[in-house]
Amino acid sequence: MKKGILSGLKVLDLSRMLSGPYCTMMLADHGAEVIKIESPTGDTSRKTGPFKIEDYEKKWSGYFVSLNRNKKSIVIDLKSEDGKKKFLSLVEKADVVVENFRPGVMDKLGLGFNKLKEINSRLVYAAISGFGNPQFGKSPYTYWPSYDVVAQAMGGVIGITGPDKNTPTKVGPGIGDIFSGLMMSFGIISAIRIAEKTSKGQFIDLSMYDAVLSLCERIIYQYDFDKTIPKPEGNGHPLLVPFGIYKSKDGHIALGIVDNSFWKVLTNIIGNKELTENQKYKTIESRQHNAKSLNSIIESWTRTKTNKELGCLLGGYVPFGPLNTAVEIFKDSHVKKRSMIRKVEIPFNDKIKPWRVAGNPLNFSEFPQPDFKSAPSLGENNKDNIFEHKSEVFKKSKSSKLRKAFGSFATGVTLVTTRQENGTPRGFTANSFTSVSLDPPLLLVCISKNAQSY
């Protein structure tokens, strides 16, 4: 069985629906042991659909399967005393707890971060909510419930999406949830890095509103710099032209001309003298001011050719791509070669065909992506010996006296420092280290794997 880059990381996942499960999916895909802790009725997404035709009992929602592959499931009633005891026994051996309740819910259960860190001082506690935890700034909306569409609306993305200002449009995928989950996965790995060094965990807070606002960063600087209120641009760009979606003979294509070098290539391919000779289209700024007429000329050309023909003319020369539906994506050789659609077998139900889910886009040269395992049935791992051993992450990082003094670094790296009283450089070879924290900074010289201390 291939091990992922996060193998040994132990995660307790209390989250539901999309934001938290997407976060822990990213971790599980790369080898973390993620234990999904569910109420007796299970995650709501189990019932959301869609369902395969042969799944007569509707036990396997596509929504749930996609986000919860590679995870385990146990049922714990956190409102019961017995459930709390079970949960706390798992916390003792875990590295991370993830939840996406409203602020205060876990505290009311007696299971908030302050309680959990008494049991496990190195625990990383990750909390995603609509408007964030009050300790980092009390929002007037702190206790409002929130889902993706609310975050998209308040964070700014809907305000700049759609054909015009009178038709605000939600972005298709749940980016308010997904981007929040993705950001939190980064936060977790960052906090784990510190916990490995200091054995001290911490609380990570992420507001979905904040995450979407950071995604819409340009509306901040545009308004601040010249009081422009960014508005929906349809399929175009407020500053760059041509940049957007254009009709073709049999569909649509995307073009993204950012600088003049690509503009020259495009105009040579199109062969329209109006584009090459008219001063209105010479510079990025002039093209922006004449966007309507320019887009009309571009589309009058693209509409005469099929997507395949445009691919032959433009592909590899300018930023170009066809507009793909699910049908085209499933057929695309890029997707196949990059393993971006993964097959997941169902070992305990041969009546249901294997699922296919979106792959994980991260690739590591030293850690091939692990095989995807099935999403768990509700409480599938109740009888398993969950977290039989304490964290492998911290077991590997126990400090020797040398590590306490010098941190750790790669095998066979010689460290050279001027800490001798007479200023003469002294070196030693690091044989089992992963990080160094010294003052003054060290000059690092890789001599050889057999270099000796001197």
Question: Where are the regions that the model predicts?
Answer:
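N-terminal helix-loop segment corresponding to the beta1-alpha1 unit
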Residues: M1-K197, K373, S377, K383-K390
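Flexible, small-/acidic-enriched active-site or ligand-binding loops
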Residues: K2, D350-V393
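Short Gly/Pro-enriched turn/cap motifs at secondary-structure boundaries
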Residues: F64, E233-P238, F243-G244, I352-W355, ...
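Conserved Rossmann-fold dehydrogenase catalytic segment
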Residues: N133-P134, K165-I175, E196-V212, K231-P238, ...
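Oxidoreductase and adenylate-handling cofactor-binding alpha/beta cores
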Residues: G181-G201, S214-F225, T267-E274
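Aromatic-enriched alpha-helical interface/lid elements that frame and gate functional surfaces
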Residues: G236, V241-L323
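A glycine-rich dinucleotide-binding beta-alpha-beta segment and adjacent secondary-structure elements
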Residues: G315-P368
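N-terminal structural module
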Residues: V393-Y454
